[in-house]
């Protein structure tokens, strides 16, 4: 007799794309209806021994590689005064949902180095979405990510998820 999947040593990491489910069923992403539709699908992953939660912390980390784009589960907002604000509401809902299903060994957050090196944020001063084009090593890239990572680390520690969270790349 096999032990429950939560006790399996095998590290199963299959990417999940909740945005594909919302598009397929034409429901609002991360609404109650969306979670109800995802529950049996993600339960299959958990029951197969899935250990890793796939989270996208930026807009389209893989450009257009997948039919359904991975949107950001974190809202990046540059305030009118130039400071940054990050809203983790969607990220938290998604992670809590997956943990409740039993997927709780690791959270893989994609990605600091996306294919296009283009980073979307909402600019409060212009009331519009903007894109920062920057490469690792450039001052703009470092400023952009340092603000987010410091805030993200604080948030993850408050939620008790810091030790299981990884910044992932593809």
Which role does the model predict for each range below?
Residues 1-170:
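Aromatic-lined carbohydrate-binding surfaces of glycoside hydrolases
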